[in-house]
Amino acid sequence: MKRRTAREKALQTLFQIDVSNIDPKEAITHALDEQESDPFFEELVFGVLEQKDKLDDMISQHLVNWKLDRIANVDRAILRLSVYEMVYQEDIPVSVSMNEAIELAKLFGDDKAPKFVNGVLSNIKNDLKQQ
């Protein structure tokens, strides 16, 4: 499975878990739709779920005039996925994670999603550089 496909499937899985609160393994089965799983895909899904509180704190610190629970579910899932990559996937350049997130926002979000996602991630990127 290509990494872009793994990210798309991970996003679909995380979105489904977030909105319907189903078991992660069931959400994975739905997202894979009889495709074979992939270690990168599973690492993204389970990594985001394990670090969700930390990721949400990081994202919340960079939301201007928004609360995390008020942003679109798909945007929230994209941000969690990308911030997880930016912080925990050291083999992936931050710029690649950001570009992939923007592409996911174009594909799955509304017209304003790419700009919103880019803005939040840019602020997080700047914070990560300072650490």
From Swiss-Prot:
GO BP terms, alphabetized: DNA-templated transcription termination; transcription antitermination
Coiled coil: none
Presence of keyword Zinc-finger: no
InterPro entries: NusB-like_sf (IPR035926), NusB_fam (IPR011605), NusB_RsmB_TIM44 (IPR006027)
Sample GO molecular function, one term: RNA binding
GO cellular component: cytosol
Assigned keywords, A-Z: RNA-binding, Transcription, Transcription antitermination, Transcription regulation
Keyword Hydrolase: no
SUPFAM superfamilies (UniProt xref): NusB-like
One Pfam family cited in the UniProt record for this chain: NusB
Stretch forming the signal peptide: none
UniProt function note: Involved in transcription antitermination. Required for transcription of ribosomal RNA (rRNA) genes. Binds specifically to the boxA antiterminator sequence of the ribosomal RNA (rrn) operons.
Family: Belongs to the NusB family.
Designated name of the protein: Transcription antitermination protein NusB
Gene: nusB
